[in-house]
Amino acid sequence: INSNTQSVSSKILTTKKTAIYREGIGCTLVGDNSGISDEASLRRQVMPNIPLLALDVNTPWPMGQQGVIQKLSPQVFSMIDGAANIQFSENKTYQVATHSIAIAHKGELVYERYAPGISPQTPLYGFSLGKTLATLLAGKLSANGELNIHQPLANQVWQDVRADISSHHLLTMTSGLQFDESYEDATSDANMLFVADDMAELSVNKVANAPAGQEFKYSTANSLIFAEYLNQQLGGLENTYSEFQNLMRQISVNNAIVQADGHGTMTFGMQDLISTRDLLRIGQFMLQKGQWDGQEVIPEYWFDYMQTPVAATMNAENSLKKSYGAGIWLNLSEPYGKILPSLPEDAYLGLGMRGQYVIVIPSQELVIVRTGTTLD
């Protein structure tokens, strides 16, 4: 551990890896002689300065930093707090480790609770919540004419059936690429991403299991390929970073980081950090179908697109066989059953590994965030 260089190195046998911290983009893992980006060149790569918003401490969430304004009845508060007590307790056969819970109703912060050491502004790992962030960025770029989601990527290495893959297929997990998303096997594709210098290259080289659009298979590879495609379309990491952070500022989000790999690809879908209140803002933004502070940030049709269930055959290897839209899971009864049985049919959610949830319930004007490191 080197505090002066803000880096951590580890070595197993002949393999050495170093993680370096860079302002604005978080930590990047690089290896010796990777042939991609050495540590020195990565440190010379400085992200554009996107100023933070000066959110007033006396202005209520979501436009300011003020906390809960108590409007719940004692009965409702007791019910919610009782449920939270269960989430924060460890008297179960598996690790719960809840970090935070926050609830917004009708656009107001009505409940929040944090584990010791966690604050409303603490950036927390969202893991696959980054897939939702990537889809929101795609909506912004699509509306601006910077991205055609139905245009084939035409990746030069794809000279077979994969040549038909578009951003739409990547966002809806219907690319047809064969990718092992399991985490139980240490050598699975998903686990290999954590030690890869170029995550998109590892993903691009996967073979096609089915033609694009015919099969739903949830895979982080789709999000990483999409992120690399954004770099190509926008002119590199710095521009992709700027587009993402500018979108976040438009919806009052200051504490959101999507880290980059050693090749310079933002790792949407697995290495994102965002604070609890900012996750709640993301959910509120989706509930409002792209409206923020009286302005249209992303057109309403994009959120209809996100909530359109994928019409493709379910791959048997999916660990979660539920309805998916674009970047979000849908709480539909048919054809696979609800992902959250106690919630209404119109509910949808961003979902990250180890229990990261951003749940939106339009019919109740409700947004719920839960973060943690739950193992089950």
Language-model regions: role of each:
Residues 107, 125-148, 170, 226-230, ...:
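Active-site SXXK
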Residues 92-100, 115-144, 150-161, 211-218, ...:
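Short active-site loop at a secondary-structure junction
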